[in-house]
């Protein structure tokens, strides 16, 4: 079976395969153009007659559980990433698969991190055929150099849920690391020595997988309250000595930036939102965990405090600064998909106004609405943007695949999307004629904030009108690009072969772009 076949040009002008790892794929048609048909996928029917009447599903060890689950060649094995770089379970699963001589597995993580670098040896020896999920760091380099046997597929968090729900991906065995569980399999992420916050990224896995194994290091008597994963979905429970390192769930800097340029980006972004009337009593916002985004949140807090306003809700990932806004009464609710530090974990556990969400509620595009389009202001990053406001978040200027999509694509449906980004990194301009990899169509990106000026998407005539009298340096994106090239020169394009090594899916499951092998 070839990795891919039947290349076509999609609605974004990108050449993409329509056969991927032996399965038919649909090319991107435009925003909201592809409408799904049919019904949701479903797991196998089960019978209580096959489970212990006392509810005790505990199995002696992870190897025994995988064997009992029927692990075999060619299966799809899923894991979640709520422990981020502190995950101790994912690699163990494939250590066991290798020991058992299993080959051709598809790994379906909700994300990968540097702690998963050991997976490269299993990609090399055929234990893992390919990854459908983020391919960060060493895994991204391995993929970019054309070494992965199958074709990689990158999806957003919402796109992952959509793919499972729609039957595009069938999970054979889901391994769900849970900081606290009872013997029945009810589990949560807010209690126990490895508490990580929510477990929402594992929701689709629990709901749709043929076999679900919960792995915990904190087994409590029934019932485990609150439960984020319902034990009625769970086949087996395994107890290990340690499943995660909570200190390593920390994402980004989790500290406000001290860089003068980044502070300027934050200040201008907040000032833009204020002058454009985007901040009001009862508004909502979402920002990331990087230093610039955290600083923007602090500027928002100052504005709210001064005017005695409140944000109705903020979308997480949560962090100590967002938690402080909640506790101060500047934010009424945090709707949180993942916690970026231990203050977020504590708050989710103790504060009923800090509630966990999942990709189903927040991001699933094949549903009856989701939360993402209700957010007033969305602050995001990007590795590149182009003169048409298209953006890239997965590859760098050298063409290497180094990041996952996360919830980035899904949040583009917010009412105003702002990208505060440096005009250049390591003397390489960030604004290009065309992004290396298309991850977000420009029609959904409204404002680019750089340390040399702010560009408003011409589609947003309302924002252009509101900012006519602003003292902020409002410029065109072409002017910003020209200034970057005057300082740094015109950047060279990365050198690629014609071979496709991975694809980027859009939120509706269509193929948005191809990632090609880097010529070393």
Short names for language-model regions:
Residues 2-520:
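Conserved alpha/beta enzyme-core scaffold
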